[in-house]
Amino acid sequence: MSRLQFQLQATDGAARRGQLSFPCGTVQTPAFMPVGTYGAVKGVLPGQLCDLGAEIILGNTFHLFLRPGLEVIADHGGLHGFMRWNGPILTDSGGFQVFSLAHRRKISEQGVTFAAPTDGAQVFLGPEESMKIQKVLNSDIVMIFDECTPYPATEDVARDSMELSLRWAQRSRDAHDALDNDAALFGIIQGGVHPDLRGRSLDGLQAIGFDGYGIGGLAVGESESERNVILEYLHPRVPADRPRYLMGVGRPEDLVESVARGVDMFDCVMPTRHARNGQYFTGFGTVKIRNACYARDVDPIEPGCGCPACVGGYTRAYLRHLDRCNEMLASMLGTLHNLWYYETLMANMRAAITAGTFFAFRRSFYLARGLDLPPLPEVAGCAG
């Protein structure tokens, strides 16, 4: 039996408010997971992540397998002990990272052979290997090994990729069970931008049986409208008692629009990566701190923000100075701010869903940015 319990607590249109429960903690949904690729969220201590509102984080199977290797992590009893994070952890399967290697990989029925980006050594990764690695990592949510469908792709290419991922899904399920791993196992819905293929993928995954469903193969170059069509198609079809995880999508607008279409979980490197590049998220848009207009600006990043950078009184002028001097404090403060913004955005959406005011929240979200309210189709209960 899986260590995960999911409770759907409220809905407002297609937007869902729920809770993931694990022995090591609970996660309120919709939830955003900071990304700890190498076993750390860049520039942030685990205790700080808790203070920012993060309840679950993501670790990267592919990169942790290559560095430091499973033996080192096993010496610490798993990823929780290795990185000193006591809350739930989701690990991806490595499929997307292998996909990103492009010409350095060879895909077969058995799995993927690739040149390791660390030293060029030939490495093989398949469903069984991915499940064994994630067992050692001892994560709370394990993702199946899949092929990320490229974009653009013809329907034939997308179909072949989806069908391969379904065969790998069955092998992932079998290997996970054989390892007697009580972590939750999520399937991953593939099929590119073709709704009928997404439906066939979901049907196949449901026949196998999973604790939750990732929506993969997005955030790879498709348009926002193409992505939304897929989410609108899937919302009434994914079992309501299973969490839905949109993988790798992370602009604030994307989070709001995806929650409006029934998504429960997100991860993205955007808040941390953008902070390292001098871009800070706020309720009125993005502050690009390298712009000259901030050279003598004595305001915090966002007046009224409760993050350590803003509460601490660090001004835009100071942050711009640090950024121009390549001081690591700029990235650290910016990361704290951006993660606070993301976690607060999720908390505000949860509160709005509970109160039945999500669509008013959505309107005010765009109004504060000076943007037009995007259309929300009157299908599948999405529109309020």
From Swiss-Prot:
Cofactor note: Binds 1 zinc ion per subunit.
CC annotations in GO: cytosol
GO MF, one annotated term: tRNA-guanosine(34) queuine transglycosylase activity
Pathway(s) where this gene product acts: tRNA modification; tRNA-queuosine biosynthesis
Domain of life according to the entry: Bacteria
Record: residues binding substrate: 92-96, 146, 190, 217
Annotated region (RNA binding), positions in chain: 248-254, 272-276
Reactions the enzyme catalyzes: 7-aminomethyl-7-carbaguanine + guanosine(34) in tRNA = 7-aminomethyl-7-carbaguanosine(34) in tRNA + guanine
NCBIfam families: Q_tRNA_tgt, tgt_general
Protein name: Queuine tRNA-ribosyltransferase
Organism, as annotated: Xylella fastidiosa (strain 9a5c)
Lineage of source species: Bacteria, Pseudomonadati, Pseudomonadota, Gammaproteobacteria, Lysobacterales
